[in-house]
Amino acid sequence: MAAAALRDPAQVPVAADLLTDHEEGYVTFEDVAVYFSQEEWRLLDDAQRLLYRNVMLENFTLLASLGLASSKTHEITQLESWEEPFMPAWEVVTSAIPRGCWHGAEAEEAPEQIASVGLLSSNIQQHQKQHCGEKPLKRQEGRVPVLRSCKVHLSEKSLQSREVGKALLISSGVLKHQVTHTGEKSHRSSKSREAFHAGKRHYKCSECGKAFGQKYLLVQHQRLHAGKKTYECSECGKLFRDMSNLFIHQIVHTGERPYGCSNCGKSFSRNAHLIEHQRVHTGEKPFTCSECGKAFRHNSTLVQHHKIHTGVRPYECSECGKLFSFNSSLMKHQRIHTGERPYKCSECGKFYSHKSNLIKHWRVHTGERPYKCSDCGKFFTQCSSLMQHQKVHTGEKPFKCNECGRFFRENSTLVRHQRVHTGAKPYECRECGKFFSQSSTLMQHRKVHIGEKPFKCNECGRLFRENSSLVKHQRVHTGAKPYECRECGKFFRHNSSLFKHRRIHTGEMQ
């Protein structure tokens, strides 16, 4: 068959669908073989020749498993020994002429102008109407229809890998498709015929117990257990078990995206990806959790969600041993150990380990405060800040210190307080080695070393390292004296001044 002559694989008919009631016979290797002349063989590159070899051998193996190929042909022997399997040009053309149908306008068209292709077409129904009308395929019990050849004109343009690959893929696919419709050739006894029509599956996988109605399906399935991947991508070297999967994969390299979304125009390389994408527009969520009823667009998302109910946490951090339900959660967690901060604020250049933290930080620049307190109307940038604030109104203080019995609104505040009892000072200054009980105190202290004074008095321009120092200083300008002595009623600007004054009344200064 001259696959080299394909102008467009979509113009080539499906051989199995060209059968008429009176044209059925037994399948032989010749009916599904693909042949090239010496001139055509030279046009194939190494990847195309390898693909050709794999398809021919697979077709022969399939027919042999069905009892339809009793001995190896000369061509198969050539392929196994890696010899060039081309035929003379006249033999390629005339080998299938008696069974063919013609694309030429006249039946007398010269054989030299045509080539046997016997492959399939993506436009099946159109071709059927041209040649066979709309007769349905009628199967005679116990017989396998012959794949008929169809002639098309030779093309002048060079072979393209995609055309040859699709043609060869189709050659193999037609044979498998035909066997699926007709059953195996070995319906020799009434018992086996009855078993086939009854839908029985006699071919059982010894590994997993799965049963199949046809032997070739079992052979294909067993590749899963054997890990056998015989089809290699010439672009990246990736291996596949089935040629159909290789063909689908090659779209990645060609960049072809034939499936377009009618709603937004986005294109996809596979129809399955388009179907999944369209759920964004339709809102369809066909995958429902049997535990909680939550629905998802993708089955993979449902599978991940199930881990919440099962408690399965297969992903373990090698640094601290913490377990996670999802690999993505583990990867985010590991940034704590690596210090990686891939998310950068475009306004101030600050980096964050998680995108969610960057989004929260971004509100500092935009001024957005989407969370409102229903009690006092105050707005907050984060939901967690609102929840903490609401405890002010409820008076809730659920966190208790076991040492002194004091209560706190937040657990973080309790943890900081407990350092008063334990004396823990986990925060060390790298400059001078001084330790602090709180991170905020360390940050304030570090300004001593770097000389940073970010807080400026608007009245006199004086700079301060801490905001609290600025607040105290501003009382000089405002005259505010918020601290009152309960003994004599005198007021003071600073709490420290009041503390010293009280010694007069207690007699400590004497």
Swiss-Prot record:
Belongs to the krueppel C2H2-type zinc-finger protein family. There is a cross-link at residues 166, 176 (Glycyl lysine isopeptide (Lys-Gly) (interchain with G-Cter in SUMO2)). GO terms for molecular function: DNA-binding transcription factor activity, RNA polymerase II-specific; RNA polymerase II cis-regulatory region sequence-specific DNA binding; zinc ion binding. It comes from the Eukaryota. The keyword Ubl conjugation applies. Keywords: DNA-binding, Isopeptide bond, Metal-binding, Nucleus, Repeat, Transcription, Transcription regulation, Ubl conjugation, Zinc, Zinc-finger. One of its GO terms (cellular component) is nucleus. Transmembrane segments: none annotated. Its main location: nucleus. Residues 27-98 form the KRAB domain. It comes from Homo sapiens. Pfam families: KRAB, zf-C2H2. SUPFAM superfamilies: beta-beta-alpha zinc fingers, KRAB domain (Kruppel-associated box). The keyword Methyltransferase does not apply. SMART domains: KRAB (SM00349), ZnF_C2H2 (SM00355). A zinc finger (C2H2-type) spans 203-225, 231-253, 259-281, 287-309, 315-337, 343-365, 371-393, 399-421, 427-449, 455-477, 483-505. PROSITE patterns: KRAB (PS50805), ZINC_FINGER_C2H2_1 (PS00028), ZINC_FINGER_C2H2_2 (PS50157). It is found in: Nucleus. This is Zinc finger protein 419. May be involved in transcriptional regulation. GO terms for biological process: regulation of transcription by RNA polymerase II.
